[in-house]
From Swiss-Prot:
Keyword Isomerase: no
PROSITE patterns: NEUROTR_ION_CHANNEL (PS00236)
Keyword Lipid biosynthesis belongs to the record: no
GO cellular component, one term: neuromuscular junction
Organism per entry: Homo sapiens
BP terms from Gene Ontology: acetylcholine receptor signaling pathway; behavioral response to nicotine; chemical synaptic transmission; membrane depolarization; monoatomic cation transport; monoatomic ion transmembrane transport; muscle cell development; muscle contraction
UniProt gene name: CHRNB1
This protein's name: Acetylcholine receptor subunit beta
């Protein structure tokens, strides 16, 4: 190969590298020119009284969580800061068309914008990435950060609540006479008055839904244009979020409603079953466990009571009353004529009147089936007819052994003894017959007393059943109305359609 051809080959191989080498050298020369005598601690103001305008924006990548217990909101964001540093401007034509540079954040002046309402004392960003400097002197810095900001939680309508959490940014080192803050610009470079959602990396929260995300510039008192020394401007970003209540509906409210139904059906359980008290106390203990579980979720505040706690307390009061009223029902059920005498008003109200309204009907006792006496058409001897009438014809029991009147027990009717010891004593029975009739009369009285005792005891049991049914319908009405009143109130608690009406 001739020397000329070798030179041509080397020139062809080195030609693609020449622009890159020249570009690196041009960028290096530009850096040396820009930072020759540059002091990153000096504010980029042409005059002493000039204010540096800093645009503050926020790009939301993820709403990590909202800790109601600690009143803390965790977010993953990109802080979008933009300002103009006249010392970092150049003519692209003089530097091989270089239009922008990426420079480490430590090398340039920074407006020192930090989160004021942080909850962990960390004011810095997570990573000091490089700033992008354009040829006209504009500087843009988008450092990522995980912020834990304080958020005042309103627990009145928990878990059907919405919260208004704020992130307050301000310059920590400069007041409003040195640095002028303004709301950030959108991706298109136009005015942007809300938090920008990073479409590519945004992760939706499973518990909270973002409703509004506006921002607002808070001017210090006085002239908002000129600024005042010692006072700082603030840019506040609002996150108005609404809770997704499905988790609490399935895991808390639905079990509470089922437990309330158990407490209601305690009054449908017969007192003889022996489980009325056990079922009531079981429901009461279950609600107590739910209250203990919710205590770790709700902030410890005395300003208001959450709506779910109101519902649990309402249910607990109902279940407590069900325990007390079950005791009353059992007390009525086990009463007897030997221990309690039924008042007339109790009999009138709970036996004769209330059952009609409660759709209760007391079964009627079956009548004694007695054969009809045979009709003797042919005349017979006097002894035979008397014998037939003695053994076949049965006098009414109320006539021989009258039942005492339950309403007026003092009224009594004559009994069988009037046939034994009449007032005129005209008819005298043989001593053997008198002893037989006296024994029969004693046995009949004992049977009658036992029958009356059982009847009065059944009356008390029927009163207990009527009271049980009355409590059942009362609890159904109170539970339905109370549940609707408590939860319908939450349906009117909605986020405002306009965050700044």
């Amino acid at each position: 190969m001739t020397p000329g051809a070798l030179l041509m080959l080397l020139g062809a191989l080195g030609a693609p590298l020449a622009p890159g080498v020249r570009g690196s050298e041009a960028e290096g020369r530009l850096r040396e020119k820009l930072f020759s005598g540059y002091d990153s601690s000096v504010r980029p103001a042409r005059e002493v009284g000039d204010r540096v305008r800093v645009s503050v924006g926020l790009i939301l990548a993820q709403l990590i969580s909202l800790n109601e217990k600690d009143e803390e909101m965790s977010t993953k964001v990109y802080l979008d800061l933009e300002w103009t540093d006249y010392r970092l401007s150049w003519d692209p034509a003089e530097h091989d068309g270089i239009d922008s540079l990426r420079i480490t954040a430590e090398s340039v002046w920074l407006p020192d914008v930090v989160l004021l309402n942080n909850n962990d004392g960390n004011f810095d960003v997570a990573l000091d990435i490089s700033v992008v400097v354009s040829s006209d002197g504009s500087v843009r810095w988008q450092p990522p950060g995980i912020y834990r900001s304080s958020c005042s939680i309103q627990v009145t309508y928990f878990p059907f609540d919405w919260q208004n959490c704020t992130m307050v940014f301000s310059s920590y080192s400069y007041d409003s006479s040195e640095v002028s803050l303004q709301t950030g610009l959108g991706p298109d470079g136009q005015g942007h008055q809300e938090i920008h959602i990073h479409e590519g990396t945004f992760i939706e929260n499973g518990q909270w839904e973002i409703i509004h995300k506006p921002s607002r510039l808070i001017q210090p008192p006085g002239d908002p244009r000129g600024g005042r020394e010692g006072q700082r401007q603030e840019v506040i970003f609002y996150l108005i979020i609404r809770r997704k209540p499905l988790f609490y509906l399935v895991n808390v409210i639905a079990p509470c409603i089922l437990i309330t139904l158990l407490a209601i059906f305690v009054f449908y359980l017969p007192p003889d079953a022996g489980e009325k008290m056990g079922l009531s106390i079981f429901a009461l203990l279950t609600l107590t466990v739910f209250l203990l579980l919710l205590a770790d979720k709700v902030p410890e505040t005395s300003l208001s009571v959450p709506i779910i706690i109101k519902y649990l307390m309402f249910t607990m009061v109902l279940v407590t009353f069900s325990v007390i009223l079950s005791v009353v029902v059992l007390n009525l059920h086990h009463r007897s004529p030997h221990t309690h005498q039924m008042p007339l008003w109790v009999r009138q109200i709970f036996i004769h009147k209330l059952p009609l309204y409660l759709r209760l009907k007391r079964p009627k006792p079956e009548r004694d089936l007695m054969p009809e006496p045979p009709h003797c058409s042919s005349p017979g001897s006097g002894w035979g007819r008397g014998t037939d009438e003695y053994f076949i014809r049965k006098p009414p029991s109320d006539f021989l052994f009258p039942k005492p009147n339950r309403f007026q027990p003092e009224l009594s009717a004559p009994d069988l003894r009037r046939f034994i010891d009449g007032p005129n004593r005209a008819v005298a029975l043989l001593p053997e017959l008198r002893e037989v009739v006296s024994s029969i009369s004693y046995i009949a009285r004992q049977l009658q007393e036992q029958e009356d005792h059982d009847a009065l005891k059944e009356d008390w049991q029927f009163v207990a059943m009527v009271v049980d049914r009355l409590f059942l319908w009362t609890f159904i009405i109170f539970t339905s109305v109370g549940t609707l009143v408590i939860f319908l109130d939450a349906t009117y608690h909605l986020p405002p359609p306009d965050p700044f009406p």
